[in-house]
Amino acid sequence: MPQDCACRKTDRYVSFQDIDCTGNARRLMEHLDRQLSIPGRSTAFWEYFAKKRAGSAAAKPDDLFLIHSNINQFREFFEQWNDSDALSLLLQIEEECC
């Protein structure tokens, strides 16, 4: 007989209930903002990304869409700067929300 685990288990294929995709995406962007505020960490790509993130008067893309669209760049950036907390959160977002 399987034992019940008190740990949180989510399954996006059953329901997005109890998965805070928007909040997790916002937290990951906070990690990105902290890293990019350190001199020497921004690149031409991240400057371009900041413009996309700001959006236009007509529309502003949401954080989850931007993460999903640039997931490999996020992974490479956080690996480069050894941000294990951001990498863990990125993996969680990828598995639960993308």
From Swiss-Prot:
One of the protein's GO biological processes: nitrogen fixation
Annotated coiled-coil segments of the chain: none
InterPro entries according to UniProt: CowN
Alphabetical keyword list: Nitrogen fixation
NCBIfam families: N2Fix_CO_CowN
General function of this protein: Is required to sustain N(2)-dependent growth in the presence of low levels of carbon monoxide (CO). Probably acts by protecting the N(2) fixation ability of the nitrogenase complex, which is inactivated in the presence of CO.
Protein family per UniProt: Belongs to the CowN family.
Name recorded for this polypeptide: N(2)-fixation sustaining protein CowN
Organism: Dechloromonas aromatica (strain RCB)
